[in-house]
Amino acid sequence: MEHETHTHPRDYRSLSLTHRRSQYCNYAGRGIYLITLCTEGRRPLLGELCGDSPARAHVRPSELGREVLRCWEAIPAIQRDLAAQKSLRTHTTCHRDIELLGCQLMPDHFHGIIFIQQPMDIPLGQVVRGFMIGCTHAYHTMLKSVSIPTVLQHPGYRSTVGIHTDIRLAYLPTSHPLWEKGYHDRPLTRKGQLQTMIAYLHDNPRRLFVRRHSARVFELRRGVQVGAQVFDAMGNHALLQRPMHAVHVRRRFSGPERRAYMNACILAARQGRVLVGAFISEYEQQVRAVALREGHAVIQLTTDLLTDYYKPSGELFDACGRGQVLLLSQRTTLDSFSRRITRAECNTLNTLAEEMAGVNSLSPPHPPPQ
């Protein structure tokens, strides 16, 4: 299939995590949340990735990183004190019972899992904002202890002050932010999700190691034309040169038809075809899982917005690192809140997959003889 890269007018490099709130969540109520904060400009201020293999990868905190961890661990006590002070001042009962379930410091961002044990008088955002302010205060305090020549070498600082002056940073602006504006949160919504969150946190250093040492297969290209369609693409772009087989398990398939169809998809992969699809239904995901486990290739159509900092999740991440996956997306904007894929989007992705594979429709396969 013909494909080429076009100049793409959109630039996602500076996208932040601002306003990624769920419109359906009560952020002052009881709940568990995975929060993510990124340093302004994604500067690696918080630590350094160490280790000589994915299994041994870990992050060694910088001095600032240790202060961030200290501020994180202080959240429950600080919020209890603030609630007690407000109760005395307003003659009301204020509860801010918070438990920290885990965290992971990375060079340019921070993940934490926070448990609001009972309804609070303030939303989660105020708790996170207090944590961010505490970290920023520590950051500015550290800046003031560093001489001008050292700071002028910092990639995040721009100054017109002469290099040869010996004044301290007390005379310099400390308004340069530590964190980018806003943060991302993911509420726990189903049973078993907490363990997934914790595993994701602990897996972050390994994932960073894999991505740094497999930069080619995580390469993001914008404006990749496939037939009449234009996509943003991440992964093994060479997969576009290979014959494809569309995967779309129809609802109308009977049990035998579905099994025959899924087997036919795996057979196509074993014959060298790249499986292409949205892989939305559980049956389509089963086909993808078997194909990846056997070492075959997959082109995943997604509604995710692909940015320079995007990383595929779950089995797709490791498969992408092995060169088995290409992600394609036509998403051009960042939603103001998390949402699920719509039925119309599902239909569009399935149609695109069939067009890429060179077919107009997929007929149910004949069931195997009984």
Listing of model-derived features with the role each one plays in the protein:
Residues M1-A228:
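Short catalytic/metal-binding and nucleic-acid-binding patches
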Residues L220-Q370:
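Glycine-biased, small-residue-rich flexible motifs in mid-sequence functional cores and linkers
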